[in-house]
Amino acid sequence: MHRRGVGAGAIAKKKLAEAKYKERGTVLAEDQLAQMSKQLDMFKTNLEEFASKHKQEIRKNPEFRVQFQDMCATIGVDPLASGKGFWSEMLGVGDFYYELGVQIIEVCLALKHRNGGLITLEELHQQVLKGRGKFAQDVSQDDLIRAIKKLKALGTGFGIIPVGGTYLIQSVPAELNMDHTVVLQLAEKNGYVTVSEIKTSLKWETERARQVLEHLLKEGLAWLDLQAPGEAHYWLPALFTDLYSQEISAEEAKEAFP
């Protein structure tokens, strides 16, 4: 017994049904998109009202400021994106981060002869707070990172290098690749590294270790100690806390800004 083929009418009916399903799906997607857009607009309006109401807290309280910026990020709003935007004018955060960026540059310049252009986030935070005075608006490490990212975007040579549980702030336009970063992380414990330590910990060949250390020396980011027992020590002054923990002196500030 032969099976009968599918007729033209059945095919047309099937295509019509598929078209209706597709049309219905498009309508549903458009409805969902419109609903989401409406919700985002409402959230943005509420966020603006919240910002207006808590303006002083956002400006004065670092923790509150972080929470507010996280809220902004959820809807793609960046209060720092423009110095003349709505958020900047309402909160004054544009001027705040601009001024903070200038202070970061000043501290890094004043300490460059000590650390070669690398400084821990903790030390930078301490020095910035000292420079601002007790009555100035408080700043957090999160504020510093946000300001540094803005400086980095301007092509100023600033960078942020993760080291253990903290960060090293690079303020010179030296090229640091992954090998350099790994060695900096290794030096975090003692403030220095040796060729043997690098070979043992990272399983590198001698030449690879020497090339990385020579580059750090050349860029002024490391100091060579040939008097150390055993073998030469390569000190990273940014990690050698005893070297830079003292406050910037008036003479150093004068040298940095004649």
UniProtKB/Swiss-Prot annotation:
Belongs to the SNF8 family. The gene is Snf8. Component of the endosomal sorting complex required for transport II (ESCRT-II), which is required for multivesicular body (MVB) formation and sorting of endosomal cargo proteins into MVBs, and plays a role in autophagy. The MVB pathway mediates delivery of transmembrane proteins into the lumen of the lysosome for degradation. The ESCRT-II complex is probably involved in the recruitment of the ESCRT-III complex. The ESCRT-II complex may also play a role in transcription regulation by participating in derepression of transcription by RNA polymerase II, possibly via its interaction with ELL. Component of the endosomal sorting complex required for transport II (ESCRT-II), composed of SNF8, VPS25 and VPS36. SNF8 is essential for the stability of the ESCRT-II complex. ESCRT-II interacts with ELL. Interacts with TSG101 (via the C-terminal domain). Interacts with RILPL1 (via the N-terminal domain); which recruits ESCRT-II to the endosome membranes. Interacts with 14-3-3 proteins. It comes from Mus musculus. The modification Omega-N-methylarginine is found at residue 4. The keyword Disulfide bond does not apply. Gene3D superfamilies: 6.10.140.180, Winged helix-like DNA-binding domain superfamily/Winged helix DNA-binding domain. This is Vacuolar-sorting protein SNF8. GO terms for molecular function: channel regulator activity; lipid binding; protein homodimerization activity. The keyword Transcription applies. It comes from the Eukaryota. Residues 27-53 form a coiled coil.
